Amino acid sequence: MSGTFPTSPAFQSLAVSSNQSTFVSRSISGRRQSRQIGGQYWRLRASFPPMTRAQFAPIYAFVIAQRGRYESFSVIPAVISTGQGSPAGTPLIDGASQTGRSLVTDGWNASIVLFKAGDYLKIAGNDKVYMVTADVSSDGSGDATIAIEPALVASPADDAAITHSSVPFTVALRAGVQEFATGTTGLFQFEIDMEEVL
């Protein structure tokens, strides 16, 4: 990995998409069958406000340093990387060998709203970002089971830390060609298209 994407200037707009490979077939009788293969990944498409050369140059230099699609890097999309809940405490994975679409956790402050559906989280030791799919609060002991998508790509270690604020996405550029536009105003226009990598 080759660093963290610059945080200034911030994205003017951000489009996030979830990509999940699913095969669907329908028989003559109308019966539908579906199956999933491969893993889910996030795609982030961001555009910047018009920038001066001094603002734009460090961003474009970072992009060029990725050598097209070769390198991966970390990006923290400010608009979505901090959740709508009020998590507090020292959250950890509670037990090894977890699989599936839920996380058993502990170490939260007691009886608080941790996540709202649509929040993101990340587990130490893994580059994958997960979305919380249902509101969740901690119980009186500071424990919580969190519903997530996609399913865990690897079983997290017991006591692995959980990142719930400023969640970093590990991404790579989606194209080898990176183009900007400028004109007589001296302002630069730029968009970047990234996809999650593990």
PLM regions: where:
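Autoprocessing Asn-cyclization modules and mimics
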Residues: 67-117, 122-128, 138-139, 143
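Oligomerization/assembly interface segments of phage tail-like spikes and tubes
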Residues: 33-52, 182-198
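N-terminal ordered "arm"
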Residues: 4-48
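Short amphipathic alpha-helices in soluble, non-transmembrane regions
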Residues: 58-66
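Exposed beta-strand and adjacent loop surfaces of beta-rich binding modules
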Residues: 13, 43, 70-72, 118, ...
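Small/polar beta-strand repeat architecture
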Residues: 5-19, 83-86, 95, 110-111, ...
